[in-house]
Amino acid sequence: FYDELGSSDWRFSNKIHSTFSDKQGNLWICTHSKGLEKVTFRSVQFSMLTPEEHSYESLSNEVRALCEDKHKNIWVGLKDGRLRVYDANHKYLGFLTETGNVSLSGVPMKGTVYDITQDSKGVLWIATKGDGLVRAESVAPNGLSYKLSRYRYDEDDMYSLSNDNVYCVYEDHNGRIWVATFANGINYISKDKA
């Protein structure tokens, strides 16, 4: 698919940051300015979620990260710094706050999210640009309240992150969490510390 910018039938973004395929077989596309696009390979071909309608250049529509959690909620990391959460039916539930709650109000969790993954224990790992790595452990059965812990760079601690610009997080088959930073290498968190 390719659309000519500004044409009256412009429907899809030509600038894509990443893609994600969920457990239902949908393809989610993180775009630069058109928000989050969803391709469904069923009777309905496409649906689009745009956090800021009619404001295509808004940072609220620049999607950087996606993750589906064990509750089938979709976590959407936006360049504006908000980590939005949608349920399986695409209903907006709110954003992750500094206190660890998914809410429609409050102070957003600090950091532009570049990657999100859920490990085998159900813990969410949130990679941020400039604000380190956030570990979010669910404290509510509905998955809308979390205990947040932040891993940061500390020049006096050789076991801290090597950089606060975290771009990717991955869990290996041994349960270790691998953390890729911008220009300062890869770190890992052993499974007993995760």
Model-derived features: where do they sit?
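Carboxylate-rich, polar loop motifs that coordinate divalent cations or form catalytic acidic clusters
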Residues: 1-194
